[in-house]
Amino acid sequence: MVRYPAVAGSFYPGDETLIEMLEKFFRDLGEHGSERKITAGVVPHAGYVFSGYTASRTFKAIYEDGLPETFVILGPNHTGIGSPIAVYPSGSWLTPLGEIEVDSEMAKTIAKLSGIADLDELAHKYEHSIEVQLPFIQYLAEKARTDVRIVPITLGIQDEEVVEDLGKAIYEAANELDRDVVIIASTDFMHYGPAYGYVPFRARADELPHRVKEWDFRVIQKILDFDVKGMFGELRKMDHTMCGPGGVGTAIVYSRLAGALEAELLHYTTSFEVSRSTDAIVGYASIVFRK
């Protein structure tokens, strides 16, 4: 079973210019490491022109720390189709850089240990939040001359109960299979503006990106503190439009269980830096969790 790309040529290049773009993102790439202290990372999932550099900061840190055997990649289900908690069961995913194999044993073990997840490929058919991460992983695996597999999981329900269940299931599955795992939580932060039907504050055009950043950093601080309850609390308090808190919460729960002691914000930006539009501003962050 092959999952074909849904957004190649739109969110990211579908031709040879993809490699050129990745080379620019990673021109400061260091040596492939072996420490393996990173347990999880947070990345955005907008078009590469807006958030690709920010995403590359997370993957650069993981590469220099040492690539794992398996990336468990969690993203929000924007389409609404398929199972609410959908683990892609087996096969491979295709991108312009080739195929990347699904770790089917890990996928099935997570679904078995979870009380809420299903094995389901339909939820992934048109979803972009996981697909856009794969070229980064493929490019770096080629650099490291190593094989890396993935477990894609889409989340249509995102709350404290879900993240506690999934974080624990992923941790227990990794232990049961003796698998070296890094979680990738795919999320964009605030979606501000009339285009998103979300205008919680008014400000002069030149002040808006700073206000968006202020609101995002209230959430980001909770993430850096490993505070799942606090993160969801801030989101509810602000009616915040972060789209992937479930993946981030799962990454925090897993990282705590895996012995992570610190989290670091590597990069933050907004779409305004590229678009210069105040009709729609989206926040993007790169974060890693380390032992």
From Swiss-Prot:
SUPFAM superfamilies: LigB-like (SSF53213). CDD domains: MEMO_like (cd07361). Pfam families: Memo. PANTHER family: PROTEIN MEMO1. HAMAP family: MEMO1. Belongs to the MEMO1 family. This is MEMO1 family protein TON_0132. It comes from Thermococcus onnurineus (strain NA1).
